[in-house]
């Protein structure tokens, strides 16, 4: 089987050994198979952002979306079309912007170790901001459930709400997400195997010697495929649960907090699944290596964050917030 080794030249010229050209690759068996010409090779290790039109265009798209949404809420003409156009422009800007980031990392060698440290800090701060986002919804739920008002009948769950059984679909979704966390960790463990270093620095052109790399990529891709499948399965079951539920988002504070919190988490699951799908295709195209795969690592961090949030959500809203009687329905 013939492999695509185009990315190897960039990885070892710009990433390995502090990402400066200190490694002579001319005698490596895969060097002469590279077909991509790398014009950009930075000689420093810092994150110098190049000129890009996407921040400006993304801001315009966000303005169109929010302005159109406000117009639609006030029944102004063409408000829905403006918000829809802004939404699709946001998706387009996300695609082209992240496409350029992938090019800078994989093909231009701009994501040095120093740059990756900054990116890691950025992802950590982003996840912390997401934690605060979910914290506000959990605060609303516990504010209403710990001291239910007279309007709710002074009980929780409120009178007239037929809550869901936590031991049915919610428990199944919990097991699905926990299993997906296991499979994505398995995939991450395989790609971080440092025994690949012997393969990369060998001059052998023997197909049997190349087999371990192919095997590791197959195992890594298979584990990642399982994770994506489990994420899609979780989304399907969550949608089925919404379809079968007897209460709606407008059924008081219970319905609003339930659907807002679980729906927000479901949106994050969809985003995380798309993130992992992109990583899956990048993995197949050999964009990742044992010491240079931060894009995949960021997706794994995000997926584990989604797992942890669901555990808190399952224990608080589904189990504790539904009352003891819900276990026997």
Curated annotation (Swiss-Prot):
GO terms for cellular component: mitochondrial inner membrane. It catalyses: 4 Fe(II)-[cytochrome c] + O2 + 8 H(+)(in) = 4 Fe(III)-[cytochrome c] + 2 H2O + 4 H(+)(out). It is found in: Mitochondrion inner membrane. The chain crosses the membrane at residues 53-73, 77-97, 122-142, 169-191, 217-237, 269-289, 298-318. It is a multi-pass membrane protein. GO terms for molecular function: cytochrome-c oxidase activity. GO terms for biological process: mitochondrial electron transport, cytochrome c to oxygen. Its EC number is 7.1.1.9. Keywords: Membrane, Mitochondrion, Mitochondrion inner membrane, Translocase, Transmembrane, Transmembrane helix. InterPro entries: Cyt_c/ubiquinol_Oxase_su3, Cyt_c_oxase_su3_dom, Cyt_c_oxidase-like_su3, Cyt_c_oxidase_su3-like_sf, Cyt_c_oxidase_su3_a-hlx. Coiled coil: none annotated. Component of the cytochrome c oxidase, the last enzyme in the mitochondrial electron transport chain which drives oxidative phosphorylation. The respiratory chain contains 3 multisubunit complexes succinate dehydrogenase (complex II, CII), ubiquinol-cytochrome c oxidoreductase (cytochrome b-c1 complex, complex III, CIII) and cytochrome c oxidase (complex IV, CIV), that cooperate to transfer electrons derived from NADH and succinate to molecular oxygen, creating an electrochemical gradient over the inner membrane that drives transmembrane transport and the ATP synthase. Component of the cytochrome c oxidase (complex IV, CIV), a multisubunit enzyme composed of a catalytic core of 3 subunits and several supernumerary subunits. The complex exists as a monomer or a dimer and forms supercomplexes (SCs) in the inner mitochondrial membrane with ubiquinol-cytochrome c oxidoreductase (cytochrome b-c1 complex, complex III, CIII). Belongs to the cytochrome c oxidase subunit 3 family. This is Cytochrome c oxidase subunit 3. It comes from Acanthamoeba castellanii (Amoeba).
């Amino acid at each position: 089987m013939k492999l695509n080794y185009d990315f190897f030249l960039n990885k070892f010229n710009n990433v390995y050994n502090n990402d400066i050209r200190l490694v002579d690759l001319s005698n490596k068996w895969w060097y002469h198979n590279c077909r991509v010409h790398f014009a950009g090779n930075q000689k420093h290790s810092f994150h110098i952002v190049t000129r890009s039109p996407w921040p400006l265009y993304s801001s315009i798209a966000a303005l169109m979306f929010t302005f159109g949404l406000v117009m639609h809420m006030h029944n102004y003409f063409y408000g829905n079309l403006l918000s829809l156009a802004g939404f699709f422009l946001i998706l387009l800007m996300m695609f082209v912007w992240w496409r350029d980031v992938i090019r800078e990392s994989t093909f231009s060698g701009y994501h040095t170790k120093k740059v990756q440290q900054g990116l890691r800090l950025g992802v950590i701060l982003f996840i912390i901001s997401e934690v605060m986002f979910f914290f506000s919804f959990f605060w609303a739920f516990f504010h209403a459930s710990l001291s239910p008002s007279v309007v709710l009948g002074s009980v929780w769950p409120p009178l007239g709400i037929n809550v869901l059984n936590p031991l049915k679909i919610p428990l199944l979704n919990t097991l699905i997400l926990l299993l997906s966390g296991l499979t994505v960790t398995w995939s991450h463990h395989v790609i971080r195997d440092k025994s690949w270093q012997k393969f990369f620095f060998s001059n052998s052109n023997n197909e049997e010697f190349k087999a371990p790399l192919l095997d590791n990529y197959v195992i890594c891709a298979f584990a990642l495929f399982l994770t994506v499948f489990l994420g899609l399965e979780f989304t399907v079951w969550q949608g089925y649960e919404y379809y079968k539920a007897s209460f709606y988002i407008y059924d008081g504070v219970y319905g609003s907090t339930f659907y807002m919190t679980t729906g927000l988490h479901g949106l994050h699951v969809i985003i995380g699944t798309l993130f992992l799908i992109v990583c899956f295709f990048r993995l197949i195209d050999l964009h990742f290596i044992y010491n240079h795969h931060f894009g995949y690592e960021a997706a794994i961090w995000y997926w584990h964050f989604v797992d942890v949030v669901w555990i808190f959500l399952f224990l608080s809203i589904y189990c504790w917030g539904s009352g003891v009687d819900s276990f026997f329905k």
